[in-house]
């Protein structure tokens, strides 16, 4: 006989998988783990120093830290779906902007700023809220499984980004 604990996991595993994928694609995860593979091709093409390039990441991180409490509040008020979906579009706009950089350093800062601000609703707090409100007996396990998205991205994104860059260029 399957108890309520096992049923909870069996019935809601798609939510765990969706949360894991959401965390992988978040503005706090994917851009940070793929940036190392882009450092050399971008800095060589535009003649920027590593410090200039990495400053855009610092800028984005600062914006992310400032917006996190607001995103938590928005999740409480509107729910994760209404926060995440528009933010995924915003994050995509930021990524598209990054692909159009023509050598102006301010464009890099703009693109990473857009990823941080417009994609702010994709941060893990949004995705994990769905887990926290849907699981009761196995909430910790469900959160742990969902948060493996960060480790998966850290393991896969750099290698995949290098391969994509080799095949198609950094844009």
Sequence positions of predicted segments:
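Helix-loop-helix hairpin linking two adjacent transmembrane segments in secondary transporters
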Residues: 150-171
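Residue-level signature of mid-helix packing/kink "hotspots" within the transmembrane helices
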Residues: 33, 61-69, 154-155
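Intracellular juxtamembrane helix-capping segments at the cytosolic ends
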Residues: 42, 119-135
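Hydrophobic core of transmembrane alpha-helices in multi-pass small-molecule transporters
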Residues: 24, 94, 105-122
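Helix-to-loop junctions at the C-terminal end of transmembrane segments
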Residues: 67-80
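C-terminal ends and interior cores of transmembrane alpha-helices
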Residues: 89-103
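Pair of pore-lining "gating" transmembrane helices in MFS-fold secondary transporters
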Residues: 11-34
